[in-house]
Amino acid sequence: MGTDIATGNVMEAADTAMNVVADAVTASAMDPKQAMRQRHTVRKFTSEPLSAELILQLNDCVRANNERLRLAISLKVGDESALPGALKLFFAKGVRNYFVLAGSDRPGLDEDLGYASADLMLFAQTLGLNTWWIGGTFSRKNVEQAVPGKKVIGIVAVGFGATPGVAHKSKAASEVSSYEGPVPQWFANGVQAALLAPTALNKQCFQVAGAGNKVSITENGGVFSGADIGIVKYHFELGAGDAFEWA
């Protein structure tokens, strides 16, 4: 009996190890479109720290976005000063890693930061991490100290979520889009992807207009409209592919 129990324990341990490996492989093999469908806002995170490998991968993604879009985004790890005490007490938990969305002030900066933040959030999702885009409720003074002379529009909390989050309430495609003539499949796919994008207060106050292969996106002019447009553009591109051009 002792041998059978030992063998059973070994087999159980092996099965557990295989499941862990399988989960890791699934996360690493997730493509951006899958990440887009699975990503939801998470406001409570576990105490599990980011590994050195995860930090390296996230910083590589930050560097690529900074170089491509002339930004000054940075990743802060193990820093709990980004949120005010009241928010941490009642609304959020475990926010200690975050991207600072920053750059030199210029026309189009907010949109570029929104676009880059979408890339960072979905990349983090492919690594098995969760995110939360925070615009108006972070401790601006504490965060801005890390990037003197730069404009900061928000932060993106990143880490291991206590839950995977839930899908936000969404408008219908007809409420946020219009197309001149019969709607091509690529446009419909792009709009559906855009509806998965996180926007300020989840209001989805954007409009996508298409004619031929030209597409434009407008917003209602709120404080975060520039960032929202960038985030929505990223998602639309992911859904529509290369069948169109921005007007």
Residue ranges: model-predicted function:
Residues 1-247:
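Acidic, surface-exposed loops and disordered segments
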